[in-house]
């Protein structure tokens, strides 16, 4: 015989969701999560940074669902077009939920529906549902740290840039030893110098646009 708890003790969330469901592009939403979750903070003393901040932004008359995450050292942001934006209120999606949802989006086919309540969010995908509490806290005004009047832009091949950084960074096993980028008009010098394991250097083609 097994001792069991009363079924009435099991929490139910279905009655809490009164807002209309919002249909999301599953592939684009997965990309949004993957692009932002890398910057989620692990510092539990600032719990409001332990997730992805989802909110509505507007550009050229179009509404976007924008996700932002930061650990105060780096910041990641990604957006996708959204309808029924008036049904969505800003919230912080917890780290664990972000990773669980990413797995669901990878493994299950079907239409992705999102619905929110006062302090919870629900995702429906195929025959699966994921309901999560959201983080109770205020996400910092990240727009204050994003440059708006920068006259400099650097264009590189993303594939070549990532490969170069991975090769050069492999020289050092110490995370505290950063990769140095030296920027010129037609190239970028990628280098790392380690007191214990040596140094690495690579040069990749680039185009620097600058008024100065």
Each predicted region: which residue ranges?
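Structural preference for solvent-exposed beta-strand-turn elements
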Residues: 1-212
């Amino acid at each position: 015989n097994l001792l069991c708890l009363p079924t009435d003790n099991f929490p139910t969330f279905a009655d809490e969701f009164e807002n209309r469901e919002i249909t999301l592009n599953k592939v684009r939403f997965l990309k949004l999560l993957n692009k932002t979750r890398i910057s989620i903070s692990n510092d539990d003393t600032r719990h409001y940074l332990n997730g992805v901040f989802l909110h509505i932004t507007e550009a050229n008359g179009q509404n976007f669902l924008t996700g932002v995450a930061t650990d105060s050292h780096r910041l990641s942001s990604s957006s996708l077009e959204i309808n029924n934006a008036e049904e969505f209120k800003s919230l912080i999606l917890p780290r664990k939920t972000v990773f669980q949802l990413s797995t669901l989006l990878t493994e299950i086919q079907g239409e992705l529906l999102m619905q929110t309540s006062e302090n919870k969010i629900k995702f429906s995908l195929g025959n699966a549902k994921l309901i999560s509490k959201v983080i109770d806290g205020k996400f910092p005004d990240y727009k204050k740290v994003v440059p708006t009047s920068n006259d400099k832009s650097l264009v590189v091949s993303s594939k070549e840039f990532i490969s170069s950084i991975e090769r050069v960074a492999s020289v050092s096993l110490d995370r505290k030893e950063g990769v140095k980028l030296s920027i010129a008009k037609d190239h970028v010098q990628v280098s790392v110098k380690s007191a214990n394991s040596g140094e690495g250097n690579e040069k990749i083609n680039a185009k620097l646009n600058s008024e100065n």
